[in-house]
């Protein structure tokens, strides 16, 4: 059985700074996704089909490489090291099951539903603040402030602190970008330390006087007599902050961009906002995943499809390719019958995104409100895309909203 290192594979470097927008989509589309299922990248290998992606996301012989990255960059102490070691994405086995059993009820669909009225209220406030002609940068006007307000509501934090929460989330999530770790580590460390201090005050206030918020729910969470420690609680809240702000901002912006580029789909959504808002969210997650690659590192030799991946091999699972497999033609269609299981944007297996229900609800309420309030959406300039090395978002999205 050949080693993966012995194979002649197409090479793809998704970290190239200029690989954005149309260039990014063209480069991704050129990679094989049917006959060929594997490519090489600067760090290891990229898996290009859904079945193989599911395997590497679910196998116990591969884990998220957060601890390896910390060692590689010499992160051996301090708040960032503490966060990486205790982050639920880097915890496995029985410890991971225990944490998920404690946190899942607080983020179940029914629990998330109680935040929907606030989501609608925030969308109304942000839309009311648009100029009368409806011309704006959708990212700065709505997509950026909206999830920060939602996460403040979810945490039970003052809404006035939403910009600070966005600032911390923006910096903390850069720990997943190797380039940022090399050039901006001190700023990432500072953001982690500042957020820890901030949430410690919130936790201390909630213990004697719980409210109807996530922190209170996690403080009271209990499974067979077990409760979260203080460090576990603060790291789960940090994880939810990072997963609930930048990712939601980027995915919502892409959803609106896609609807602006496909006016027929916008009119379908306008005709049935309540029925098609969630399918529109699912189609945006499938078509333009803001986490196009999910990393794993082999902790033992892995044999798959007659190939041996040696221990230490880094594998990137391409949700972009997996989400498209078997779909012909590959068009953005919010009325198509797409099985949710086909989408790997939130991952798969035990490390499936803990905040997926919250993210879906945020985007669903935002699109539903816009469809009820806005008659048409059109691009008012060229979108500015970010890089695909971490979260693949939009720096700006100039649009015109006919209110």
What are these regions (language model features)?
Residues 1-403:
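Cytochrome P450
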